[in-house]
Swiss-Prot record:
InterPro entries per UniProt: ATP-dep_DNA_ligase, DNA_ligase_ATP-dep_cent
Keywords assigned by UniProt, alphabetized: ATP-binding, Ligase, Nucleotide-binding
Biological process according to GO: DNA recombination; DNA repair
Listed NCBIfam families: PRK07636.1 (NF005796)
Gene: ligB
Name under which the protein is recorded: SPbeta prophage-derived DNA ligase-like protein LigB
The family this protein is said to belong to: Belongs to the ATP-dependent DNA ligase family.
Xref: Pfam families: DNA_ligase_A_M
Length: 270
């Protein structure tokens, strides 16, 4: 049984509030796990069934009529989630990466929806399931302490934190202001060296000329400014190449090949 997950709103700064539960944000793949008719099934947030991709979760001992929400990760040697590794595991049956299902919510119990119950009650239900499994980790969270948790995320080079209203219901298929995320962004100076003709993705490079990947996210006003500044050097069937323009971008770490992950425009350096 698939349940469309509750999604997060993004905010820029963490805060302390005892009316919220704070959790570390794990960089992985959102996964809904359900057990009905004594069959465990796994779904991505977009309702793609991926049960066969994670066979190690098939023996999880949970009552029939249960639906869990969580994130599948692969932990790197230092313990931090490795997004590239979990995607490699997701895409290839030959991958030997061990996964961990980090469970943070329960939506159905005994075949009945408990989505309307407050988060604190759902956390109690989650703990009562006693999910004792080598590939499962229950995220309990802590009351308040948003600032301290965000500093910990930065110290450990984690993706960020999630701050959830303690009395919030589980809002199925909705991006809610009751659940907030604060991303631990990195900031890097790069050059825009061109853009794609079809969907206007910007080509980025580092000052030494090596590729930094593509950037999709730039506010409309800044796109207008970009097009007024650009000086076209040459074109191909797919790309327009320009004289390099220096800018700052924010992003979620770098890939093993040095590319920026999900870069977005921050400011001009001209």
């Amino acid at each position: 049984m698939f349940v469309s997950p509750m999604l997060l709103h993004s905010i820029k700064e963490p805060f302390n509030d005892e009316n919220y539960i704070t959790e570390l944000k794990f960089d992985g793949i959102r996964l809904i796990l359900s057990k009905f008719d004594n069959q465990i099934k796994l779904y991505t947030r977009h309702n793609n069934e991926v049960t066969s991709k994670f066979p190690e979760l098939m023996d999880l001992d949970i009552p029939d009529g249960t639906v869990l929400d969580g994130e599948v990760i692969v932990a790197a040697s230092g313990g931090a989630p490795d997004f590239e590794a979990v995607m490699e595991r997701f895409m290839s049956k030959k991958s030997a990466h061990n996964i961990v299902y980090c469970v943070f919510d329960v939506i159905y119990k005994d075949g009945q929806s408990i989505a309307a119950k407050p988060l604190t009650e759902r956390k109690t239900v989650l703990n009562s399931l006693e999910l004792d499994h080598p590939n499962v980790f229950v995220i309990e969270g802590t009351q308040g302490n948003g600032l301290a948790y965000f500093n910990l995320a930065k110290e450990k080079n984690l993706e960020g934190i999630v701050i959830k209203k303690a009395n919030s219901p589980y809002e199925i298929n909705k991006r809610s202001h009751n659940w907030l995320k604060v991303i631990n962004y990195d900031y890097t100076e790069v050059l825009i060296t061109g853009y794609t003709k079809k969907d206007i993705k910007f080509l980025l490079s580092y000052p030494d000329g090596t590729s930094a990947g593509f950037m999709e996210f730039m506010p409309h006003a800044e796109r207008t400014k970009f097009h007024s500044m650009k000086q076209v050097k040459s074109e191909s069937d797919e790309y327009v190449f320009i004289e390099p323009i220096l800018c700052n971008v924010k992003h979620r770490f770098k890939t093993k090949h040095g590319k920026l992950r999900i870069p977005s425009f921050e400011s001009w350096r001209v």
